[in-house]
Amino acid sequence: VRGRVAGAVTWTAGRLWLAVLLVWLWERVTTQVGEAYFPPPSEIVATGRELWFSGPADRFFLTEEAVEDFGPSLLNLFAGWLLTGLAGVALGVALGLSRTFARYVEPIVHFGRAIPPPTLISVFLSVFALGTSMQVATIVFGVIWPVVLNTMDGVRTVDGLHLDSAEVFGVRGLRRLRMIVLPAAAPKIIAGLRISIGLALILMVLSEMFGSKHGIGAHLVDSQRDFEPAAMWAGIVFVGVLGYLLNAAFTLVERRGPHRHHLARAAT
């Protein structure tokens, strides 16, 4: 245990000093150059604090701008991602279990995956009009494919011996799916969900740039139009930090996946 803790501390410290060095260099260079479009990090942080985190203590220091910028974005992000997870895992399981179903549907999946989601924003605008439905639909269409394909691959790689053993002991249908198939496919499902959350973050921002009045994407457009580079960079930094934290959380879960997979195999 001590070795793991020491290794984690060393790994974190190794990354931390590099991040500090890069921020310091950014501060020094931008201060010396004085380019308006590239403000120093100190100005970006101060602007972000003033915009979003200078509210009253009873609201956790969040301002009205924070609620308008973060609330719709996080709602769109997690609504789209949750719908993607449910639909993607269900479709992936069906494709993995049924070769006949996969023969007809898998080509459609690969065709849909090849379409760049931004090219369909105008279509979604026509179908759903401007608003949350259009933004969530853009996210779902753009990020469902890695979930479907990873789930399908995970289901297809389940050890046949375990399935045969389950058949002998009368474990069939949904019970077999819950006890054997899903636990064995869990590492690849989690990997697909981790990839999809990063894509969902990108499409969240992109969809909000098209006529939306609220959300971090709308904030970026407004800041650029009003020539407020520090506010624009504050939004970019927020998106980057959010993406890093989400990826780190899924990486942690993914690292525990093989251990759980091993336990699931041992239990069968």
Protein language model features and the residues they cover:
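Short cytoplasmic-facing helical segments at TM-TM junctions of multi-pass membrane proteins
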Residues: V147-G192
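Alpha-helical membrane-protein architecture signal
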Residues: V45, T63, V67, G71, ...
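N-terminal signal-anchor/first transmembrane alpha helix
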Residues: V1-V29
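C-terminal transmembrane helix and the adjacent membrane-cytosol boundary/short C-terminal tail
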Residues: R156, A234-T268
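Transmembrane alpha-helices
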Residues: A137, F141, L174-S207, W233-A234, ...
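Transmembrane-helix boundary motif in ABC transporter permease subunits
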Residues: A79-V109
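Generic hydrophobic transmembrane alpha-helix motif, especially the helices
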Residues: H110-P146, D153-G154
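Periplasmic/extracellular loop-to-transmembrane helix junction in inner-membrane transport proteins
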Residues: Q32-L82
